[in-house]
Amino acid sequence: PDPILGGSQFPAQIASEYQKLFADAGVHLVTGHRVSSVRKHENAEVALDDGIILEADDVVAGLGATPVTNLAEDAGLTVDNGVVVDEYLRTDDPAIWAAGDIANYPDSVLGRTRVEHVDNATMMGKAAGRSMAGSDTPYTHTPMMYSQVFGVRWEAVGALDASLQTTSVEVGD
């Protein structure tokens, strides 16, 4: 767990500003811990990995995602951080395609990757459909990520990783 919200994705200055947006809006963030359990009483009780119990009106947990690949594995498909596909989004079975959050695909900028975001899922789903219909156009879309929090919008292209060189551009009113 990151000690600051978005600390492993954003450069330190941007992560600090992002966390401040939540704090300024009255959101109490608990970072650097994992949730070990949540119980419902009159309010929610959240137990953290260090034994601290928090009471809350509501709980929002950012847990990340692990692709569920059992069906692909049972079908004998290659699985490595998702279902492995080629540039046409075909698996190693030529009658099966995969797209979206579960697909591990070759990207010209990022290398072989799997992306969990609506932009990639939408573009990849359309490309897989075209490929199934006979198109011989490879999937070449490099994904973008975006979000809007408390009136502040951010966008990123490529990998979100705080260790990478990042360019930040602020757009005024």
Indicate where each model-derived feature is located.
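FAD-site-proximal beta/loop scaffold in flavoenzymes
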Residues: E42-A47, I53-A127
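Mid-to-C-terminal Rossmann-like scaffold of FAD/NAD(P)H-dependent oxidoreductases
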Residues: I102-D173
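A structural signal for short hydrophobic beta-strand segments in well-ordered beta-sheet cores
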Residues: V35-V38, V83, L89, D173
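Conserved N-terminal Rossmann-fold NAD(P) cofactor-binding segment
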Residues: D24, S36-E45, D49
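Residue-level detector of anion-binding/catalytic polar loops
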Residues: H28, T78, R153
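Rossmann-like dinucleotide-binding cores of NAD(P)H-dependent redox enzymes
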Residues: P1-S37, A121, H141-V149
